Amino acid sequence: MGTLYIIPTPVGNMEDMTFRAIRILKEVDLILAEDTRTSGILLRHFDIDNRLMSHHKFNEHETSASVVKRLLGGENIALISDAGTPGISDPGFFLVREAVKAGVDVYTLPGATAFVPALVTSGLPCDRFAFEGFLPQKKGRQTKMIQLADERRTMIFYESPRRLVKTLQQMAEIFGADRQACVCREISKVHEDCRRGTLSSLALHFTQEEPRGEIVLIVGGADADTVMSRQADDNTPEDGETTKPRRKSKYQLKQERLEETD
């Protein structure tokens, strides 16, 4: 029986590639790549001449069965994404799950991912955090934010430059304008930059200065006083009501109003 290797690749600087990753990519029987053209540049840089097969979110359900069959037949196979660690906001989970079900050994190498450097650099608490990845693009986007409004842990999001300002503005309204955050762009690349501030100040900054590049957004968690105050406000009866909580809280009504504009 073969082995499936999950290989992180640099998110920017080629020097972030590990010796072990290079060795395994040279030794395996097959490399699965999210985009063979993009990965081809990386592989040529490290003189890795090996068979490549496309494996991405549009075909992973179809190709995983054949890949598992090859693994069961004794082939050693490596999976890489365009950048970072497969399975983290990239294809990988489905294949790993199917390989595990089939009893195949799976080894994931430690290595590059964009959110860990961004989290540590942000200056926000990183002892406990919630990785949220990409928010829904359309319907449900603000609803998801509302669900996270009372999250006490530091939150990590991936975002596109064209949606960043709107996201910051929505978060300022839902989480609070003074919530601390950090926008990290182009991690491990030439123009790497991290800007810290409140959600409202960051929204203003990027309204005036167009954001570019790949973005990791780090948002501080809600403090205990804010959570308790919001919960108390939601359960405060209106004039003429009994002490029983309202059927729908102010917070719930706000959620419904925002859902209509998602």
Where are these regions (language model features)?
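Class I SAM-dependent methyltransferase SAM-binding "motif I" and its flanking Rossmann-like core
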Residues: 94-151
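Loop/turn-to-beta-strand initiation segments
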Residues: 3-4, 74-78, 154
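Conserved helicase motor
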Residues: 54-61, 134-136
